[in-house]
């Protein structure tokens, strides 16, 4: 397995170009199964999960090509089962189910794998599809969905806010007969992006970005060209990199309007922030950040995917900050690793109390999930001495070329190829 060796401490300053959002590209790629004509998707990041998705789509009979953009032609799809071999590495595969049953009347997806953070049941996907008229069976580790004729529009009230299930229901409902209303829908920018993509193909979706999405079913979806929105979590990660190192960074090709809660907390931590239509700059003027209290919650509140980065910020800040995680259990696995680097923190159920220290020291640490591992790499950039981060395949699942981008900001980082 590959590792990163990071030599610190360094101040991170410079420019970084933000990639397309993985969490929008994935649902969009799966939603392309609904299209009867070719689709061109631009700004798709080069990531392991994206490669897996492209493999999965081609196993279903989709023509998939990548040259700059990703080109998808799902007109010849003739296999309706997403096999365990591919699904086990990536839980997003469940998103194949809605489009398959909506367009072809049948679909099977193996129960998914992915990051080891907490319980992420597929129940909400299943109940949503059942409410649209699909019959669902769980057999031999597969979720099997079928419907006679078309799905039927329904009024669906989500038990809890779920990005994944909102995508499944919204995608499937585009080809249902009649109108579907999703109440208590997720409001994330990636949901809005997926809806806008579907509308480009001829869907009739309104209300995306609010907690009530309305989908008027259509008979078919055609082709189109769509550009995936920039990755707000990658943006936030590089802003934190500058904030914890007293540096100055300019993020280009990003969308400040998707990061309100994060920018507010960075300003509270003492960062000087300016924004334009597609850029954000942050300047710490060489100062240490001030500790901030953070509570994760569904969008537009503070995102759980930025929690680990702000835990690190608090651990090197002036003062004490409290971080409360309300979305996933088991999402403080980076904290014991940071404690090995000299951080002072106590975990109490879903809260971590961070006492800022002036400096961290390099150590051997292990990545546990995607965002936690990015924080360990950033910690290595500012720690004294050498840090080795093991199991970085987690990072490769969600950050495109993170070592190249950090190097451009002045980090001393290299990838050590595993056996």
From Swiss-Prot:
Parts of the chain that traverse the membrane: none
Major place of residence: cytoplasm
Function: Cell wall formation. Adds enolpyruvyl to UDP-N-acetylglucosamine.
Alphabetical UniProt keywords: Cell cycle, Cell division, Cell shape, Cell wall biogenesis/degradation, Cytoplasm, Peptidoglycan synthesis, Pyruvate, Transferase
InterPro entries, alphabetized: Enolpyruvate_Tfrase_dom (IPR001986), Enolpyruvate_Tfrase_sf (IPR036968), MurA_subfamily (IPR050068), RNA3'P_cycl/enolpyr_Trfase_a/b (IPR013792), UDP_GlcNAc_COvinyl_MurA (IPR005750)
PANTHER family: UDP-N-ACETYLGLUCOSAMINE 1-CARBOXYVINYLTRANSFERASE
GO terms (BP aspect): cell division; cell wall organization; peptidoglycan biosynthetic process; regulation of cell shape; UDP-N-acetylgalactosamine biosynthetic process
Modified residues (2-(S-cysteinyl)pyruvic acid O-phosphothioketal): 115
EC number in record: 2.5.1.7
Species of the source: Cronobacter sakazakii (strain ATCC BAA-894)
Domain of life: Bacteria
Catalytic machinery residues: 115
Binding site for phosphoenolpyruvate: 22-23
HAMAP family: MurA
Family membership: Belongs to the EPSP synthase family. MurA subfamily.
SUPFAM superfamilies per record: EPT/RTPC-like
Residues that hold UDP-N-acetyl-alpha-D-glucosamine according to the record: 91, 120-124, 160-163, 305, 327
EC class: transferase
Coiled coil: none
UniProt KW Glycoprotein keyword: no
Name by which UniProt lists this protein: UDP-N-acetylglucosamine 1-carboxyvinyltransferase
């Amino acid at each position: 397995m590959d590792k990163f060796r990071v030599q610190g401490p360094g101040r991170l300053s410079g420019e970084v170009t933000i990639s397309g959002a993985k969490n929008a590209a994935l649902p969009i790629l799966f939603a392309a199964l609904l299209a009867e004509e070719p689709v061109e998707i631009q700004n798709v990041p080069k990531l392991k999960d994206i490669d897996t998705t492209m493999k999965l789509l081609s196993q279903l009979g989709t023509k998939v090509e990548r040259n700059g953009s990703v080109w998808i032609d799902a007109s010849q799809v003739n296999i309706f089962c997403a096999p365990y071999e591919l699904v086990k590495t990536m839980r997003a595969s469940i998103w194949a189910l809605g489009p398959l049953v909506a367009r072809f009347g049948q679909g099977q997806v193996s129960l998914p794998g992915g990051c080891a953070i907490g319980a992420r049941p597929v129940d909400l996907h299943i109940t949503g599809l059942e409410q649209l008229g699909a019959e669902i069976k769980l057999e031999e580790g597969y979720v099997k969905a079928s419907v006679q004729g078309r799905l039927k529009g329904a009024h669906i009230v989500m038990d809890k806010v779920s990005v994944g299930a909102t995508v499944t229901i919204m995608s499937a409902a585009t080809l249902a007969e009649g109108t579907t209303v999703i109440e208590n829908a997720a409001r994330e920018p990636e949901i809005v992006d997926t809806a806008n993509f579907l509308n480009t193909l001829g869907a009739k979706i309104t209300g995306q970005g609010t907690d009530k999405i309305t989908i008027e079913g259509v008979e078919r979806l055609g082709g189109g060209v769509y550009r995936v929105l920039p990755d707000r979590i990658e943006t936030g990660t590089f802003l934190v990199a500058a904030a914890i190192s007293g540096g100055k960074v300019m993020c280009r090709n990003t969308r400040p309007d998707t990061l309100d809660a994060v920018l507010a907390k960075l300003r509270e931590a003492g960062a000087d922030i300016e924004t334009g239509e597609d850029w954000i700059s942050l300047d710490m003027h060489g100062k240490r950040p001030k500790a901030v209290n953070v509570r994760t919650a569904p969008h537009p509140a503070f995102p759980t995917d930025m929690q680990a980065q702000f835990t690190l910020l608090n651990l090197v800040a002036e003062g004490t900050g409290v971080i409360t995680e309300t979305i996933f259990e088991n999402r403080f696995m980076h904290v014991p690793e940071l404690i090995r680097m000299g951080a002072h923190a106590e975990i109490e159920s879903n809260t971590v109390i961070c006492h800022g220290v002036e400096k961290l020291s390099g150590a051997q640490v292990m990545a546990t999930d995607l965002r936690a591992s990015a924080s360990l790499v950033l910690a290595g950039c500012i720690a004294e001495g050498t840090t080795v981060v093991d199991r970085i395949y987690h990072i490769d699942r969600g950050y495109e070329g993170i070592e190249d981008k950090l190097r451009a900001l002045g980090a001393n980082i290299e990838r050590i190829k595993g056996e």
